[in-house]
Amino acid sequence: MDRMALVVGVNYYSDKRIQNLSGCVNDAEEVARLLKHNGDSSRSRNFDCKELYATGPDHAVNRAAIKDEARRLFQSKAEIALFYFSGHGYIESTGGFINGSDSTRGDEGLSLRELVDLANGSSARHRIVILDSCYSGAAGSVAGMENHAAIAEGVTILTASRSDQPSLERKGHGVFTSLLINALEGAAANLTGSITPGSVYAHIDQSLGMWDQRPVFKTNTDSFVSLREVDPAISLDDLRKLKKLFPTEDYEYRLDPSYEPRDEGRTDAMPPAEPRNNRVFSLLQKYNRHCLLVPVGADHMWNAAMESKSCRLTLLGNHYRRLADQGLL
């Protein structure tokens, strides 16, 4: 398998001065469950996940274990190497840290600088680091990294909060990972069913208020990468029909009452419903529901048909039309 993920959740900390957490392991387990298989009807395999969970004294995850497994991950020949951590984080003037069960001080954790160095030096084409910990936004920042480049080509970092913010738990679950899980389940999917790091960030960012913790997204990649696939909202065959129905970007598709299958509102002067046009209209309505087209001179598609108006593509619709025209769907 060319996709590998290291998923770490730390609830338990051996030092009594460090508060144990309640939702990190559950969050990490759910992230791993979603990464292992795609969410489309085929349920095809996705990431090969290594899981480290600290739940108590007999099941601790120490800093050395996190570092060793992170090194193994980023030294692999995987196409995509993904690191996820949920647990305590710490920041000081020299940078940030993520803390294993054996941490007695915040700066005894795995440094974010060291983690980013491992990702930067990896031969994997795509290296993705996702951190749900306090002050995780320090990862990839130039400050405190001296002459190190923040992130190398092919590296993407998504963190729960900025370098000066704590990460929040509500009802035993991290706010960030709850939204991450929602995104991976399909809320961040595009129309073709792909869930990307960028779409995950956009979903999380748009779901939080200005007074909440703010996620951080940093990437240095020029190629498309999908974290997970779900069933597309519109079939690829239907999306490919855009270029036939709309020969040009500014083309307006003319409608008339024969496109509407129902007789409600139809007068004797109007043409009857025509099955072929009804099938086309059903597809146009599907495009409209997914913001690919809008009626022209009418509030709704029904009005556009019954009043012999037209419909045209939106900017998003033209984007998918171009993809279809270029053979990219």
Can you annotate each of these PLM segments?
Residues A5, A189-A273, E307-H319, L323-Q326:
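Caspase-like cysteine protease fold
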Residues G9, L35, R127-K218:
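Active-site-proximal C-terminal subdomain of hydrolase catalytic domains
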Residues S14-R33:
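Glycine- and acidic-residue-enriched helix-capping/strand-helix junction motifs
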Residues S22-N26, S42, A54, D58-V61, ...:
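A short, glycine/acidic-enriched catalytic loop
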Residues G297-M306:
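Short, Lys/Arg-rich nucleic-acid/phosphate-binding segment
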